[in-house]
């Protein structure tokens, strides 16, 4: 049996797969999204939350390009909080507690309603090949789907093994079988692969928790949503609870460390440093006598509670003992035990910045298969792969994500240049240009790019145009004004009486000056809405820093323009250490800027590469 032909086939309908398929379809591609079950599209396999520090920036950027995660999270959000609110706007991150069922249903609706996107139920066991090129997929029932490109978003399913204590069994996640035939097929491509692990905590019955003695955590009164299209929260808002481990909890865990899958030697994969298991916390932070736990309800009509902070691979009986030693959980019932899951991943240095494999034309990888952890990182990669697979088919240039224009660009560059030694997670600290890569201006940075690509719909175009007009009007009023220090002082604003005239934007850049303070000086600003006021304030706050940062951005762009040929032989370059030759060969940097970020790179080594490139240019032009 043969299915209809498609332009792009996406394998897997998790966060990466859904975003990849939707992006490809928005680009006009006939797209097939293959999932074991349509009901599994959009399942939140781990924590019931979207966003956070760095992660919230990724969701905003996905939304700016008309991706779906932000809209779906807003529809399913049952508690919204802006993290790092006390710090500067550049490092604040929106986060939402989500109703698992609402999220899954909203994502399925997005997939079903997208023109050009077809959902196919089945298991992919092999690739269709035309020579050395991937040209579609083969399903378990023997049927085939032909395509010009395939995007693999297998999550934790490639040779996945679930560990609970000393009991191990195959599984892609609890209740689902792993993908072994596809993993074996990837072996045939001789890709650099390894094993990683992640974990999840036991799920608790909220009806058996004593909420009355726990600290209550409410959401923000004025919730900050993800999508630039959303007007307000859709679902009823709820509170979460906070409790802590204690000395008794730690003693139970310490006594049973040898029974943990991780410490008992059953797991070879490396886990995420920034989301450690409770066993890891007890060992690595032995001086701490308590760890915070957030009790997060999984839905409005669901009694299940996710105890964020105690993921584990201890045996079930130990899980019951240590959980019931925690305040408020003395009588709790465990609905599903926590577990660790180990799975295959591909060294992302084998990928191009488009997330394609140079040695396997037609194949793109996105999500946890590339060594990342987290829904948001997966979704962002899915969109990158979907857009780039489409532009390649259309004969267009690759999508120019870079460290200067997006957190997406930072992540892709980190992965493809530096690789991973542990599951990669996004943080604001990874972005050197984070002052200009704020969550609030993601649309200003990326929606024009989306309009140029053709992946942005009419509604977003119109919303963006209205916002841009409001910002331009307010900015023009500020820029065109001019005030003496005395005039500024009469408005109650304290600045140096140095005799220098300043425009409104320069005044707004002073500490503690707010947009409202300038209304007496520029009455036309009185009609400016709250969102525009806040955005202009942030632009002014960082204006001087960003101006200085632009010099670094320009230097990076010059280095990015110095392209390194894909067949450049680093091993033949005298003067480089063998270690650096190996790292450069693995990373295959596409330009001098990327080469400079390879671990162990020195100015002298970079000069050698530049000299060889220039000799090659002269030889070609001779």
UniProtKB/Swiss-Prot annotation:
Where is FAD annotated to bind?
A: 12-17, 124, 179, 368
Gene Ontology molecular functions? flavin adenine dinucleotide binding
- GO CC annotation terms, alphabetical: cytosol
* Residues annotated for NAD(+) binding in this entry: 271-285
| Cell location | Cytoplasm
Predominant location: cytoplasm
InterPro entries for this protein: FAD/NAD-bd_sf, GIDA_C_N, MnmG, MnmG-rel, MnmG-rel_CS, MnmG_C, MnmG_C_subdom, MnmG_C_subdom_sf
Short name of one Pfam family: GIDA_C_1st
Q: Keyword tRNA processing, does the record have it?
A: yes
Q: Which residues cross the membrane?
A: none
Any GO BP: tRNA methylation
UniProt keywords, alphabetically: Cytoplasm, FAD, Flavoprotein, NAD, tRNA processing
Q: Which cofactor does it need?
A: FAD
State the oligomer form and interacting partners: Homodimer. Heterotetramer of two MnmE and two MnmG subunits.
Functionally, this protein is described as follows: NAD-binding protein involved in the addition of a carboxymethylaminomethyl (cmnm) group at the wobble position (U34) of certain tRNAs, forming tRNA-cmnm(5)s(2)U34.
UniProt family annotation: Belongs to the MnmG family.
Against NCBIfam families, the record matches this protein to: mnmG_gidA
The name under which this protein is listed is: tRNA uridine 5-carboxymethylaminomethyl modification enzyme MnmG
Query: What taxonomic lineage is listed for the species of origin?
Result: Bacteria, Pseudomonadati, Pseudomonadota, Alphaproteobacteria, Rhodobacterales
- The gene designation is mnmG
């Amino acid at each position: 049996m043969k299915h209809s032909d498609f332009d792009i086939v996406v394998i897997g309908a998790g966060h990466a797969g859904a975003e990849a398929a939707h992006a490809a379809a928005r680009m006009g591609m006939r797209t097939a999204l293959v999932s074991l079950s349509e009901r599994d599209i959009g399942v939140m396999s781990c924590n019931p939350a979207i966003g956070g520090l760095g992660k919230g920036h990724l969701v905003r950027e996905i939304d700016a390009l008309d991706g779906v995660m932000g809209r779906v999270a807003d529809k399913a959000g049952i508690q919204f909080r802006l993290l790092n609110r006390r710090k500067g706007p550049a490092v604040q991150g929106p986060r939402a507690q989500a109703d698992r069922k609402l999220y899954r249903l909203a994502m399925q609706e997005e997939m079903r309603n997208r023109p050009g996107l077809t959902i196919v139920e089945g298991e992919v066991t092999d690739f269709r090949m035309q020579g050395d090129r991937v040209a579609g997929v083969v399903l378990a029932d023997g049927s085939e789907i032909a395509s010009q490109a395939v995007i693999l978003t297998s999550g934790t399913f490639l040779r996945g093994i679930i560990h609970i204590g000393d009991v191990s069994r195959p599984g892609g996640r609890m209740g689902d079988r792993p993908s072994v035939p596809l993993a074996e097929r990837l072996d045939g491509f001789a890709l650099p692969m390894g094993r990683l692990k992640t974990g999840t905590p036991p799920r608790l019955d909220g009806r058996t928790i004593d909420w009355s003695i726990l600290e209550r955590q409410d959401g923000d009164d004025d919730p900050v949503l993800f999508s630039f299209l959303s007007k307000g929260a859709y679902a009823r808002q709820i509170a979460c609870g906070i409790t802590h481990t204690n000395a008794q909890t730690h003693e139970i865990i310490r006594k049973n460390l040898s029974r943990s899958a991780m410490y008992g030697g059953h797991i070879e994969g490396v886990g995420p440093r920034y989301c450690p298991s409770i066993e890891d916390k007890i060992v690595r932070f032995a001086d701490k006598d308590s760890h915070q736990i957030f009790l997060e309800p999984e839905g409005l009509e669901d009694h299940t509670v996710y105890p964020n902070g105690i993921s584990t691979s201890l045996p079930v009986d130990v899980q019951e003992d240590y959980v019931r030693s925690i305040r408020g959980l003395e009588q709790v019932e465990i609905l599903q035990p926590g577990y660790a899951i180990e799975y295959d991943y591909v060294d992302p240095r084998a990928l191009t910045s488009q997330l394609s494999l140079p040695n396997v034309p037609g194949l793109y990888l996105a999500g946890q298969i590339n060594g990342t952890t987290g829904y948001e990182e997966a979704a962002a990669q899915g969109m990158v792969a979907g857009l780039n697979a489409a532009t390649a088919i259309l004969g267009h240039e690759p999508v120019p994500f870079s460290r200067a224009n997006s957190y997406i660009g930072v992540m892709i560059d980190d992965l493809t240049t530096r690789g991973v030694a542990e599951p990669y997670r996004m943080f604001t600290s990874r972005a050197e240009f984070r002052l200009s890569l704020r969550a609030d201006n993601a649309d200003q940075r990326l929606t024009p790019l989306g309009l140029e690509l053709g992946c942005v719909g009419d509604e977003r175009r119109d919303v963006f145009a209205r916002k841009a007009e409001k910002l331009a009007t307010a900015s023009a009023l500020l820029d065109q004004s001019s005030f003496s220090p005395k005039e500024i002082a009469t408005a109650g604003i304290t600045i140096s009486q140095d005799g220098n005239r300043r425009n409104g934007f320069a005044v707004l850049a002073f500490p503690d000056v707010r947009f409202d303070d300038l209304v007496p000086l520029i009455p036309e600003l009185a009609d400016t809405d709250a969102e525009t006021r806040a955005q202009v304030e942030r632009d002014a706050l960082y204006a001087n820093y960003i101006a200085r940062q632009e010099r670094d951005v320009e230097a990076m762009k010059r280095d990015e323009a110095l392209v390194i040929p894909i067949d450049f032989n680093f091993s033949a370059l005298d003067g480089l250490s063998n270690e650096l030759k190996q790292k450069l060969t693995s990373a295959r940097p596409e330009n001098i800027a990327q080469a400079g970020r390879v671990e162990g790179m020195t100015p002298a080594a970079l000069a050698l590469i530049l000299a060889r490139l220039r000799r090659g240019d002269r030889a070609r032009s001779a």
